[in-house]
Amino acid sequence: MRFDPPLEEGRLLRRYKRFLADIETTTGELLTIHCPNTGSMLNCMVEGGQVWFSRSNDPKRKLPGTWEISETPQGRLACVNTGRANGLVEEALRAGLISELNGFTGLKREVPYGQENSRIDFRLDYPDGPAYVEVKSVTLGFDGTPVAAFPDAVTQRGAKHLRELASLAREGVRAVQLYCVNLSGIDAVRPAQEIDPGYAAALREARAAGVEVLAYGVCLTAEQVFIDRRLEVLLGD
């Protein structure tokens, strides 16, 4: 996935009201841009840190700029636009890069399912039945270690999705939790027990129920981002 038009550079001044960020561009322009991330962005939100943003020409948009990438204190790049994750996964699925999910004959996005009024990110159809795939975007890293963690804030919605997947798996339906790790320099991912122990417990319960837990990393630059490798999942059990 190429960033088109090309991203512009700046430095972060502040993030506020969750969805807003003030930046200064390399030309000295002061802008308020959209922050497309509802998490805490623990290691992605350093005042004065380098950021990259896209700019839309849509006259209907109140804020033409969207925050796309941050440089972390450890010098990694993080794609903070969580809306990119599903597009990256679909691109990789169609290219056959997620080997565990190859062979599908149909792909649908945002399909209603479950008992708690959920929508699954992807339903993949196979000759022997469907697979339901939930995608989470991961950007949290600690102290320069090559292990990312999810979530970066308490997520009741994320735990709900795991319950829904576990219910499917118990009924004999293929259910998959896929972590798209949008952080460079990562080899593995784990649940962030110290941030949301409820989510970590729900993930372990989901896997015990038969949910497949996969993680894939990306190649990320200021020009493009794409899924390029499978990562290890560390559940601590």
From Swiss-Prot:
InterPro entries: SfsA, SfsA_C, SfsA_N. Disulfide bonds: none annotated. One of its GO terms (molecular function) is DNA binding. Pfam families: SfsA (PF03749), SfsA_N (PF17746). It comes from the Bacteria. CDD domains: SfsA-like_bacterial. Belongs to the SfsA family. This is Sugar fermentation stimulation protein homolog. It comes from Pseudomonas fluorescens (strain ATCC BAA-477 / NRRL B-23932 / Pf-5). The gene is sfsA.
